[in-house]
Design a protein with these regions (language model features):
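Active-site acidic/histidine clusters and adjacent loop/turn architecture
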Residues: 67-117
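Catalytic cores and adjacent binding grooves of peptidoglycan-active enzymes
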Residues: 2-4, 8-11, 42, 47-52, ...
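Structured segments of extracytoplasmic/periplasmic soluble domains
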Residues: 81, 100-111, 132-135, 153, ...
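Charged, often glycine-rich, active-site loop that binds/positions anionic groups
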Residues: 123-138
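Sec/Tat signal peptide C-region and signal peptidase I cleavage site
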Residues: 37-41
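Acidic helix-start/capping segments at beta-turn-to-alpha-helix junctions
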Residues: 113-127
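N-terminal secretory signal peptides and thylakoid transit peptides that target proteins
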Residues: 7-34
Length: 191
């Protein structure tokens, strides 16, 4: 991923997910029109996220991207609500997973917040969970700030899973017994 520099003292990355979508959109326009569409055809519609962290009681509804740029304060707030709630450690979340969450919200067509089961996990928290057989990967995308486990109050887990899989933007894990869906911005796969 290409670096966007620092947002609020936190490094940001350009999400290849929407870039890939933009490329497909431009390719479709070229096929339909027969001409290369100028740059203004690329959508700069605002992207928003709504999150509730039941572990901390915090909630957030914010536009995190507008006018072609990530919004520093919004990204900082998202990073905080997605922090490791066991240790209060925060790290910059990958822009790709923010965009997955934003697209998932749009796909589900709901303004309600996602309930955050797990966002960033410190290496110590992840290792503790791994050693206690909690079903986490030893080298989890959560450690890299590239994954979020979530659920929705108004949408079934199946609806969330199907919507996430339809995006074709990363990993989607379905955990009905634990009542959450895992989304990440790694390779496209599902389980």
């Amino acid at each position: 991923m290409a670096s966007l520099g620092e947002i609020g003292g936190l490094p940001m990355q350009v999400s290849p997910l929407l870039s890939r979508r933009r490329l497909l959109g431009v390719a479709a326009a070229v096929t339909t029109v027969g001409l290369v569409t100028p740059a203004p055809a690329i959508s700069y519609a605002p992207r928003s996220i709504s999150l509730y962290n039941p572990h901390t009681g915090e909630w957030l509804r914010t536009v995190y991207w507008a006018d072609g740029h990530y919004i520093r304060e919004a990204v900082r707030d998202i990073n905080w609500i997605l922090r490791d709630h066991h240790t209060d450690e925060m790290r910059p979340m990958d822009a790709g997973v923010l965009d997955v969450l934003g697209m998932l919200r749009e796909q589900l067509d709901t303004p309600e917040p996602f309930l955050v089961v797990s966002g960033y996990r410190s290496p110590a928290t992840n290792m503790n969970m791994y050693l206690h057989g909690e079903g986490v990967a030893k080298h989890s995308y959560h450690i890299k700030g590239m994954a979020v486990d979530l659920r929705s109050e108004r949408r079934s887990l199946e609806q969330v899973r199907e919507a996430a899989m339809s995006l074709q933007c990363g990993g989607v894990g379905y955990y009905p017994r634990a009542s959450f869906v895992h989304v990440d911005c790694g390779p496209i796969r599902h389980w």
